[in-house]
């Protein structure tokens, strides 16, 4: 396999108009791998560290330091490594940084290199990225968890829950699931218009109206599903990302204007799961509320998927702690939370070995990079969260999954309802 011959980087813009890092790696046979790094709005305290400039450019959010780290520090250190030696490459990156949170060179610098090398190696091998990473058996297309109504940190409104998602579990193919999701999205827009509600969109393409309660959002989506001609619960299920760390402080949660306990929220989620066909709840409790997580998982873990995002931050060590405590039952996978491809794959493998599900995810600050679409298929996630069927940085991932399904042809399998074995059956 060709070795690494050149490493370059540049500062580009993400979907929120903030700078991010793009890395290009060229191998000795001339093949190129390019990767752009995403960035989150609601970030966990335990995530790997993005290196930002902190000067006057771009309000302090420039990434010229991270770009320089790629060119001046990382490039020379990995020159002539074989591109297929991903684990060795990533270990080299981690050692070169030398800090627990990757704060010296920046997780944004390390991840850009890690992904660009993998993409170059795939190109050199003549394989699509999903096949290069997942091997000959990778064929499972994920259920798109479409965030069609935004609140929390993704929208400037009074809705606490950050994401209200639809999951087209009854579709027979990924292409059909994408069509169903798009049709519900447009139906929801007409429902909102008829109510005189705002139809502007948030960071991830979902609508962002101001609503009196969080349950009102679920009712509006249910109406949109019905208007589009689909059956709630059998054709299309619901999912939430509460992002509760965002409204947690000093041991309590400020929810719908009141100070609430973990026990109150647990009762609230139990009511929602009973009233609506909700298959997944992400970050229902805060990232350091371990006792609350354990109690909630014991109570609801047999009925609904409970996803740790801020809780686990795609970190195998934090995930191992959660598994030992029986906190949550699923892992959200965000490559930039941990900073290398190898560590991401290790986290997913640990989840699967331990009976936890895994959901591949974008960030609110995205680019046209489609790596996570391939990665979702490569690691058999069965679920992907990459926004509404709107805004091209979101749709880019969905379109890549369409291409993958087409390439797999008869071998393609759509995860569908099987992705959520804990779901409450409709009826």
Curated annotation (Swiss-Prot):
Subcellular location per the Swiss-Prot or TrEMBL entry: Cytoplasm; Secreted; Cell surface
PROSITE patterns named in the record: ENOLASE (PS00164)
Catalytic activity: (2R)-2-phosphoglycerate = phosphoenolpyruvate + H2O
Gene Ontology annotations of biological process type: glycolytic process
Domain of life, source organism: Bacteria
Cofactor entry: Mg(2+)
Keyword annotations from UniProtKB, A to Z: Cytoplasm, Glycolysis, Lyase, Magnesium, Metal-binding, Secreted
Cross-referenced CDD domains: enolase
Chief site of localization: cytoplasm
Role summary: Catalyzes the reversible conversion of 2-phosphoglycerate (2-PG) into phosphoenolpyruvate (PEP). It is essential for the degradation of carbohydrates via glycolysis.
Protein name: Enolase
Organism name: Frankia casuarinae (strain DSM 45818 / CECT 9043 / HFP020203 / CcI3)
Gene: eno
